[in-house]
Amino acid sequence: MSDILFFSFVSDEAIKRERLKAKELRKSRWWQEKCASGICHYCGKKVGKENLTMDHVVPLVRGGTSTKNNLVPVCKECNNKKKYLLPMEWEEYLKNI
């Protein structure tokens, strides 16, 4: 995973705007309900809602947005491993570990 290189054509300003949107969504009832089960979207582990983070399925640096259909609750371990990977790259990574 660490040897994957890509160039981001998303501006720093656009990423900053999307991060602000994500921050607002974290405060929403919608997000609280998404996290209520305490289960990671990727690995399925029950880690508790306080240990879930917000992940952009399509990362911001890859053109993703902070919209409800692109945000999932994940454990910190999965979020740290996934980083900037697209869904199919993440699935490939999981197959190879």
Q: Across the structure, where does each feature detected by a protein language model lie?
A:
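Short, non-ligating residues that shape and space the ligands of small metal-coordination modules
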Residues: K49-E50, K81-Y84
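Short, cysteine/histidine-rich loop/knuckle motifs that typically chelate Zn2+
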Residues: Y42-C43, E77
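Cys/His-enriched microdomains
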Residues: G38, L52, P73
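Short, charged surface segments at domain edges that flank catalytic/cofactor-binding sites
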Residues: S2-Y42
